[in-house]
Amino acid sequence: MLPTTKAIPKEMLPVGRYPIIHHVVEELIASSLSRLLFVTNRTKLAIENHFDDYSELMMHLELDGSEMTEVSRFDYRKRGVEFFFTRQQVPLGQTKPLGTGDAVAAAESFTDGAPFVVAFGDSIIRSAEPVPLLRRMIDSHLAHASACTIAVYEVPPELTHHYGIVVPVAAQTEAADCQLAGILEKPAPDRAPSRLAVSARYIFGPQIFPAIRAIPPSSSGEIYLTDAILHLIQQGHMVRAVRLSPREQRCDIGNHRAYFQTFIDYALADPQLGPQILDYLRQVLAHHSGNEGQPAP
């Protein structure tokens, strides 16, 4: 995402009216999660600032009723939500953190032996389901006493090398909630055991922490969460996957094309400005269809 993210954390890029991480937090709250730990680093102070107390700002704003209602949603203390922050350390002699497994390990004392949710801050899950994805994952995790539950969705075969790909047990390959026999990190299309890609949402039990400590770093020196999950499976722990439904969408902000598409989706869904944006896009498309190479009106 460079140069866009040279000075702005990717998680703070706006999508519609809010930064990406704000959408993720609202998704967590919608599934009744109220104690949220952000694992960040020194380049991501803007995230902490975004979720800071808004009372001083409110005193200096002159807002009408609708604006006041919108801004008051940022008062997370009144909503019973607590935020905590810790930094993923960069070891001496290294130039970057040690990967997703190391980031999860930084939360061990915070979780205090209880099951917990992991949500990557650069991916949004849009859901039109009455029971959202994370709530279904939590219910499955508790019902099966799992060590790990992963969100997955189907990707085209040619894209498997961009994702972790799961291996359902033979009898459950089409199930919406299935047990896993394995997981591979970014396999080539001809080696992919399925088209079910990991979708940036996990639920773990405390078993994940010794699994992270047990696995060796990759050739790049990183500790991959995928390897720790495979270790859980190999040790006989229950690991499951819950599929996104047809009414759910993963918005993976990993490149500019995906970011532009996601922003357009959210702009069109805006309750106030969506119809105007749709009219504008129709004008732009009509103009381009008849005036190739000319600037839009």
Residue spans of the language-model regions?
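Structural beta-sheet core signal
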Residues: F38, V118, C148-A151, A241
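Conserved N-terminal catalytic core of the sugar/cofactor nucleotidyltransferase
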Residues: P14, Y18-F120, I125-E129, D139, ...
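Terminal amphipathic alpha-helical/low-complexity segments used for targeting or macromolecular assembly
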Residues: V25-S34, T43, D52, A175, ...
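A short acidic, often aromatic-flanked loop/helix-cap motif at beta-alpha or helix-coil junctions
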Residues: V90-L98, P157-E158, P189-R191, E248-C251
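Conserved core of the sugar-phosphate nucleotidyltransferase
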Residues: I124-A211, I215, S219
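Short alpha-helical oligomerization interface
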Residues: K6-K10
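Short N-terminal binding/cap micro-motifs at the start of the first secondary-structure element
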Residues: M1-P3, A46
